[in-house]
């Protein structure tokens, strides 16, 4: 564990971390057992607004989870909507694996197409 990760863990103790992904929530509970992970729904801009304005998150059963102190969201989604400046830290795949198939590209070509196969071999 790097020193920076240990500092992050201490700072997150007792905080509420919001995420919309079940996979991320599971990783967060393992990484930061002293933090409370809450289901945080909505489009990316909506979630950022709820974070900034400390708006309590409504639960499907009608209750409230309170407001979040931090959010874990996909960096590519924030970049796509022009909000990359909101990213304070990128979590490495060593800490939190991306979703299965995320950033995966597959290419098919006929087995007999040697020129295409040679070109594809350079990027494999």
Where are these regions (language model features)?
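A conserved helix-loop-strand patch within extracytoplasmic ligand-binding domains
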Residues: 1-35
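Small-molecule-sensing regulatory modules
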Residues: 30, 34-124
């Amino acid at each position: 564990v790097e020193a920076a990760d240990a500092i992050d863990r201490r700072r997150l103790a007792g905080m509420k971390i919001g995420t919309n992904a079940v996979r991320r929530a599971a990783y967060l509970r393992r990484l930061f057992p002293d933090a409370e992970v809450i289901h945080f729904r909505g489009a990316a801009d909506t979630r950022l607004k709820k974070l900034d304005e400390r708006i309590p998150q409504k639960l499907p059963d009608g209750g409230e989870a309170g407001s979040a102190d931090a959010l874990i969201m996909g960096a590519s989604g924030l970049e796509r909507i022009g909000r990359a400046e909101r990213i304070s830290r990128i979590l490495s795949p060593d800490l939190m694996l991306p979703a299965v198939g995320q950033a995966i590209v597959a290419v098919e070509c006929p087995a007999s197409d040697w020129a295409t196969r040679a070109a594809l071999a350079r990027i494999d």
